[in-house]
Amino acid sequence: MRIEKRQVEGQPLTVIVEYPEWNNSVQSLIGKIEKMDLSFVGRSEDRSVSIGISDIYYIENVERKLFLYTKDEVFRLDGTMPDIESRIFDTGLVRISRTCIMNTDKLREIKQIRNSHLEAVLDNDEKLIVSRKYLPEIKKVFRKEGV
């Protein structure tokens, strides 16, 4: 595989994938590239903002309301956890508890804190509780990424 990188000012990010034959690896690569463009619309007071996957730290369900957390802002989301889960497949966002979805790209470390719980520490020093029930999903993401 050959990778070429080139900065072109004033142009949107463009990715061209050239391949000798269509196969699962090519399909997976294109799927991941397309997922990078996925975004959610979050509301904060009187404004609505489009938030890309790469800006999301975690999504939390609090008293039947969804909140999306970025590095330093919180937005209200419409929908339900199952709605969100159906959109985030293969993006690095994974369910870590009944009420929380975390972006594994923002994960700094996981450590055990109690018998059945783990603590995820994110790049912004936010700490989230990880249920052991969801640990296999997190491990699966790390295996895919070669971590």
Feature-to-residue mapping (PLM):
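N-terminal regulatory/sensing modules of transcriptional regulators
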Residues: 1-27
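Amphipathic, soluble alpha/beta structural segments
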Residues: 2-10, 121-130
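Conserved residues at beta->alpha junctions
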Residues: 19-20, 71, 98, 132
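C-terminal structural segments of small proteins and small subunits
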Residues: 129-132, 136-137
